[in-house]
Amino acid sequence: MINRRTFSIGLGSSLLAACTDGTVPSSAPASRMRPVPNAGWDAWVANFKGRAASQGISQTTIDRAFAGAGYLPDVIERDRNQVEFKRSLEDYLAIAASDERISTGQQMLQRYGPVLSQIESQYGVDKEVVVAVWGLESRYGARRGDVPVVSALSTLAYDGRRGQFFESQLVAAMKILQNGDTTPANMTGSWAGAMGHTQFIPTSYLAYAVDFTGDGRRDIWSEDPTDSLASTAAYLSRAGWVRGQPWGGEAGTVSGTPVAVLQPQTPGPRIAVFRNFQVIKRYNNSDSYAIGVGHLSDRIAGGAPFKASFGPDATGLSLKDRKELQRRLTSAGYDTQGADGVIGKNTEAAISAYQRANGLSVTGDPSVALLRQLGG
């Protein structure tokens, strides 16, 4: 099986996009994703149609799929200008298990409680884990992506950098349309073709998506997240989820014999992980992602934050200090676009503006001295 994140644009792209100083979102606004004429793409599509037909795609489906499709140069720009984000676990968890993400997750757990309990009963995957995946993948449906999937995948396949992979996803998208699960207009997602509340790529959709509502369609694009949540549980279940076993937790706080004890950041908490931790990594092959999902699920369920401290960073500032620095900068008129304690481009720009306005050396770097200078 192709891991649904083999094409990943970085560590938890949707998650990072939601960060105060996060990266560009995994899906650009539709207004920026406008098709432009491209003779090369036209020729590629003409040839692809024959290949799609040879794999059982009807002419009607092909015609419907490409009726409004086009070449999207912004997709190529994003694919060629990816940045691999290497955040510390502390920063990652500050985003993944932020107060807002926890409280919203708890609201969603309550709102969809009955159906989530049914999903948990059928697939054996903790409902809090399913909600946590939803929270990290699309911010509980707020960032599902609005890029036309057929246009995005055909553009990427034509470009050729990972042409074979994206063509396989495009064929899978054609099969989804042919099955009647959605329409070309409704088949939207990220610029890389990940779709729905929990960001399934087309091949994973074909293999794992389920119709939990019983309406005859596996509708992961609907405002109703039921099919998406059930599909995520089905995916994790088939990946080997062990019913009733924890994903892990801070060492010394979970019972049972873990398969490993990790300490991704020193100083920082030691994380005891069980088999279900590896199952989460089948969704996104990253230790930080799996810890983020697991810890967020625990917090949604009412669990406590990790006890062990990460300590100050290289600048001498703790997470609490960095949040306070962002608040003070914003209060002084230098907006950091929020206060999550993660130092990124917005905070660096605010620091630079403050330094410039006050006759200081412009570095954009946080420091204990800067925090003190900003006062209370």
Stretches found by the model and what they are:
Residues T20-E120:
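An acidic, Gly/Ser/Thr/Pro-rich helix-cap/linker signature
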